[in-house]
Amino acid sequence: MSNLTGTDKSVILLMTIGEDRAAEVFKHLSQREVQTLSAAMANVTQISNKQLTDVLAEFEQEAEQFAALNINANDYLRSVLVKALGEERAASLLEDILETRDTASGIETLNFMEPQSAADLIRDEHPQIIATILVHLKRAQAADILALFDERLRHDVMFVSHLWRRAASALAELTEVLNGLLDGQNLKRSKMGGVRTAAEIINLMKTQQEEAVITAVREFDGELAQKIIDEMFLFENLVDVD
């Protein structure tokens, strides 16, 4: 099995466990990892019985080792990387791996929750914290959650258009909030947000709610409201073209 890379082995394992389980695995991977595995999977033409048997045997052995030793995964990974790459390179790579693993995983939890449950979870937080969370969600999920807030809270979507500048000041509070709500997950600083994000989310709301939000934004900042409307119009045109 020496000719198989780690990616090859992962692809074989994913193709073995079935579509539903493979999809669940993908939910826990970064976009880059999903792209790498998907590209490799698309190039698979044939898997021999020996390759399949070897991969499953290796996976079983690794799984049993972790279960039997109750091993600390981070410590184990660090030891392996140090032996393979040396102390300095291992430390740098491990930092990147753990940062990628932890990035926005708490936010991903909200993406898969029922909108009502997610809305109930965050509705009592500061509007800026709620807005910061919403711009990291899938647009449809964010719109559904917004629709469940009262009118006054929905209007605070105007914060979204400035979040990329406010993210640093809100980050500490946001991390603390999510630590309590979602079992200690972390949020990596991001430049997500802006007029486009606001427009995409508002576009997915019901017409009456959409108009109310735009009206509230216009009262606060007419120029900003017009920018959002222009972006919404552009977004709708792109959808029509598709």
UniProtKB/Swiss-Prot annotation:
GO BP annotations, alphabetical order: bacterial-type flagellum-dependent cell motility; chemotaxis
SUPFAM superfamilies: FliG (SSF48029)
Keyword Disulfide bond recorded: no
Membrane topology classification: Peripheral membrane protein
UniProt GO cellular component terms: bacterial-type flagellum basal body; plasma membrane
Signal peptide start-end: none
Keywords: Bacterial flagellum, Cell inner membrane, Cell membrane, Chemotaxis, Flagellar rotation, Membrane
InterPro entries documented for this protein: Flg_Motor_Flig, FliG_a-hlx, FliG_M, FliG_N
Pfam families the record matches: FliG_M, FliG_N
GO MF annotations, alphabetized: cytoskeletal motor activity
Primary site of residence: membrane
Localisation: Cell inner membrane; Bacterial flagellum basal body
Family: Belongs to the FliG family.
Function: FliG is one of three proteins (FliG, FliN, FliM) that forms the rotor-mounted switch complex (C ring), located at the base of the basal body. This complex interacts with the CheY and CheZ chemotaxis proteins, in addition to contacting components of the motor that determine the direction of flagellar rotation.
NCBIfam families (UniProt xref): fliG
Protein name according to UniProt: Flagellar motor switch protein FliG
Annotated source species: Shigella boydii
Taxonomy of the source species: Bacteria, Pseudomonadati, Pseudomonadota, Gammaproteobacteria, Enterobacterales
